[in-house]
Amino acid sequence: MKKLLAAAVAAVMTMSASMAMADGAIKIGEIGPLTGAAAIYGTAVANGAQIAIDELNARGGQQYELNAQDDEADAEKSVNAYNNLLDWGAQMMLATVTTNPCIAVGAQAYEDRVFMLTPSASSADVTADKDNVYQVCFTDPAQGTASAQYISEHNLATKVAVIYNNADAYSTGIYQTFDAKAEELGLDIVAVSTFTDDTTDFSVQVTAAKEAGADLVFLPIYYTPASMILMQANTMGYAPIFFGCDGMDGILAIEGFDTSLAEGLMMLTPFAADAQDEKTVSFVTKYQEQFGGVPNQFAADAYDGIYALAAACEKAGVTADTSVEDACDMVIAAMQEIQVEGLTGTMTWDATGSVTKTPTAVVIKDGAYVSAE
């Protein structure tokens, strides 16, 4: 946790320096949890976005300013942060990091005509009925479908169990499309167990999977409950393949967690830090030098999000003098015309705000994420 707080402070200090730039910069507001239980996500987003801002400004031409606000993954605090950013002069938002705050802020931004691009809020509800909210991340339905396809195409299991949070929109959204696609593909789902946000004992869920003979357990959940499930399975001597989605990214950074229990865990993610292409190597190197640690896919999505906003602004002719409302309409049109070659793939968007790109499968090996291919 101390490392997370240090990274958050470093991010804010870097952003403060960025905000001291001269007039003439397009102002981008960013909202996410820099403190609290979800700080792993929010700090990574702030850091990745800042690297992109620095690169864009270093190349000359149109300049950009980033102002990151902490919402502690709380919807009410997120709306307050949004209003603070409008008072600051934000012309568009890279926001928010988590789903429930994004839905709340998105509703307000729709009324105000402020363009929002979320790096990581993946629920379909984020963009529903809002023409001004776009996503860099995969949607929950897309993650569920892609996971079932990957498990089937790679013959990872003969029997599959699922453990998901039925009180969480992210988890439920992924499960629903996974279940539908698994049935279509003929995957044998032998056990489905649920839990809620306050669950700390997963013995019932793990026992159900074990007794059903599942050789793969699909976990469309966040990393904190996933770590508890891995500990419970280890206690019971149960060692199937555990398979998750982007919410699993961060499990290796949990303070006090025995990361050896995550060995062999697989997940679909848009980003693999061990990739050797020039863009990824450069990003990982800069991230390690500036913030320490290996960047996760949240950092990569944020980095790509800033570049997408810059590409849309350039395409549409947005400047520092463009009003918030005009910038919103101009960027909406441009987002449907641009193509961004990012860390997380080649990205295009349609009028629904959803992104099209291809996920990557990674596996934890020797305490690090590596490509599963």
Please annotate each region the language model reported.
Residues 4-7, 22-373:
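Extracytosolic ligand-binding ectodomains
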Residues 2-10, 14:
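Sec-dependent signal peptide recognition
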